[in-house]
């Protein structure tokens, strides 16, 4: 990995094992093909009924879903839940520039692809396994735009997405290049515009 993700994963597992009794299995890819590729591999290997995806910097607590369950926000009619930093009940701590960049990207995604989801880029997402397997098997993008492709794939299958509040804290360990990555993502968004789903 060219970024610090492997070291972050190793550190997280060590800390997690110290404080919890949950078993963790690390799946290592031979090559760094991007976040989308890593998630696709993880979903393929997952065994339980629900699959949670999240960013390794833990901007959102791994156990945020417990708060959702406590508030009875998980319903049978929904199979996919997206953490949303724009939700009115979310608590978000991030720098001003990242906030502005996020707003611009959200506007572009909505304008170009007619997507109504307000926060496609929050990495904290919960899927029913059968849905995750179906959608991730069709995923082609491995970069930051993979989140947008997931929404389009879900939309094509008429699978509803429910956006839920999160407590989100910006971590400086993020591998996002604030100059180059948004450009690549915009190109990816326009390419998705002309793809059939």
Give the residues covered by each predicted segment.
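A conserved acidic beta->alpha catalytic loop
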Residues: 1-7, 58
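Active-site phosphate/pyrophosphate- and oxyanion-stabilizing loops and adjacent acidic/basic residues
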Residues: 7-10, 40, 152
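Acceptor/aglycone-binding surface of glycosyltransferases and processive sugar-polymer synthases
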Residues: 22-24, 29-45, 50-53, 62-144, ...
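Catalytic donor-sugar/metal-binding loop of nucleotide-sugar-dependent glycosyltransferases
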Residues: 115-116, 142, 151-169
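Conserved hydrophobic residues forming the short capping helix/wall of the S-adenosyl-L-methionine
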Residues: 9-17, 72
């Amino acid at each position: 990995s060219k970024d610090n993700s492997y070291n972050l994963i190793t550190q997280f597992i060590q800390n997690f094992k110290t404080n919890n009794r949950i078993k963790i299995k690390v799946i290592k890819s031979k090559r760094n093909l991007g976040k989308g590729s890593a998630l696709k591999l993880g979903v393929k290997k997952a065994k339980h009924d629900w699959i949670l995806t999240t960013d390794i910097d833990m901007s959102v607590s791994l156990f945020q879903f417990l708060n959702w369950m406590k508030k009875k926000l998980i319903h049978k009619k929904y199979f996919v839940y997206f953490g949303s930093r724009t939700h009115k009940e979310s608590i978000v701590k991030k720098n001003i520039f990242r906030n502005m960049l996020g707003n611009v990207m959200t506007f572009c995604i909505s304008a170009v692809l007619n997507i109504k989801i307000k926060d496609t880029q929050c990495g904290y997402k919960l899927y029913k396994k059968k849905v995750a397997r179906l959608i991730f098997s069709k995923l082609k993008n491995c970069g930051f735009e993979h989140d947008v492709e997931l929404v389009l794939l879900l939309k094509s299958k008429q699978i509803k997405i429910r956006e839920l509040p999160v407590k989100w804290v910006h971590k400086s360990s993020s591998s996002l290049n604030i100059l180059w990555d948004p450009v690549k993502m915009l190109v990816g968004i326009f390419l998705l515009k002309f793809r059939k789903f």
